[in-house]
């Protein structure tokens, strides 16, 4: 087997690589789903590739065929240029059968096998033509598509096939990530829970013993500094002594130049700060007073899908495949194990159509995760305050749980938070779905194992909701992996905030969605009225998440608010709709939109 100099375009694993992977997977997994076809041949594409004829007519001359090709592809293959593009097949998998399966493991296995079977039975004729023509390519299964590097003639030849639905670009997307504030080491201030965490009423849920135990949250971002003191204890690959990154980490960055994490990092590494920060807000707690995370009892895994903030649809899809069925380091999706899939994913990134990202490219992958019982939580975007600025995939999709940002400690929408309705796809869908604190959020930095920084953005609001979902599923296991019912539970329990800026007041509306997250209300507890800047302390007795109702063992005291004693017992009734706290309809208070600074390249942690 020829060595592949560019892992972006992969081969069927060599014999030695198969043996390596089988050591992890065992004979049962080895006998499972067959290889996902992908190959690369070093030769340049054959000149005859674009001269294929059918019935004496040169392929690609027909306007219908050319209409399948996205404008980005046409532009970037002009004058003989080569570009990367997706060949999306017309025959996509039907995953509706997963809805009738009772457990996450059954859903995930069904979705994985259905998708892989569909890709194998439909892609082979195209793959064979690409191999014969010496054209670089890689197969994907979560979207039945093939990534190709080729010329305009190759794109036209593929578009002419009746089994091809469209040819879409793989542009480099420059995410406008928030800028970090000053970095602090070993903060000396009294131990407190972060104000944004308190404002969601998460500590009241902790007091019942529900901290997210047995829930796994996945980070799709710039990577994660896994050795950080607030993250390492919560990494699924850490057993207290050693780190095991198999099934717990994947790097989709294969061809970066000068990235501090390099390419194909075999261990979690963050090349900016963004991924460590968002992961910390979801699950972070160093055990020494830095209570920065919503669900400190949950575990995390990760996949780097951005190179210092720059992503591509292929990188995004590669990470979504890894989350659907994680696989060991140095292995391929063929060795995936869907039973190791996370429960929830954090997605503080976007794929703007204005940069060439098709509104359709990622949709099938998002829907596949939902069918498998994985909740994809997505940042609404930082293009506010005009209406219809929720315009980037994946935030625009129905199956994405899209999050707006509040000015922390208030019920005012942040000025930068994107608004709906979604018009880019013609749906007029109400977005965001829900809102959470997203300004001056303190969490992990990637510059050191005891370093913290602050940042603002819908990126920061998103992990609050990922953590809230983990707490919900921990407290009410009957809702676990029931995506629609779980979202309804959080939406109905939210503090509804009316706004007519971009449509009717709702709820929901196109500014706040259903309103501010209130996780205590969602699990059936009465919630106190928070102060603008609470500084609570809490001590929770951990318990295994399950159907039994735990006995409260802690009192949560919030400074400058009435003392709330956790005496309510969480119930597992998913049908009751909690009564929302009555609120007035505030006018959004404008706040200055922070401008990103040039992305730094901090030194990554030492290789374990």
Model-assigned labels for residue ranges:
Residues 80, 98-99, 166, 193, ...:
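Subtilisin-like serine protease catalytic core
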Residues 242-250, 394-474, 521:
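Extracellular S/T/G-rich loop segment that most often corresponds to the catalytic His/Ser-adjacent loop
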Residues 61, 72-75, 194, 292, ...:
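C-terminal subdomain of the subtilisin-like protease fold in secreted/lumenal serine endopeptidases
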Residues 43-48, 527-607:
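Ser/Thr-rich, Proline-interspersed low-complexity disordered segments
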Residues 323-357, 379-380:
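Short acidic, glycine-rich surface-loop motifs adjacent to enzyme active sites
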Residues 46-48, 52-55, 110, 161-216, ...:
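Protease zymogen maturation seam
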Residues 52-182:
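Inhibitory N-terminal propeptides of secreted protease zymogens
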Residues 301-309, 438-506:
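Hydrolase catalytic cores
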